């Protein structure tokens, strides 16, 4: 038995076929793989990505910290809640890992979110925490939250039907 996302019981109730993915019990399919593939390519589909590491970053040096840590420029995140794909660099400019940074929203103007791969969790967090020591920032891992990726050409409409604003 592996690690479980907050949505694990829902996957079981929906009769998902579960597999080990990096130590996590994750759904690989519910019905036909081909039908699910076509649904996402032609319409929409949802994926539990809660096994990925969700970090919240706050503090007066949050932007400076991210600028030091990443190859990409977080100043490019001009709209609230927008995401930026980047790589995290070591002290010599080599790539440690890739990740996604989300800009703060009007509701939480000082809160940045960073999504890190689950397979490199320990290494990435150790590096991020070591770098944070030189900045006035706080890194908080949020294992209590679920993350769902909604993908496909009709994904925006589906999300808008559930969430009323700023999507």
Residue positions per predicted region:
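Basic, glycine/lysine-rich polyanion-binding surfaces/domains
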Residues: 1-167
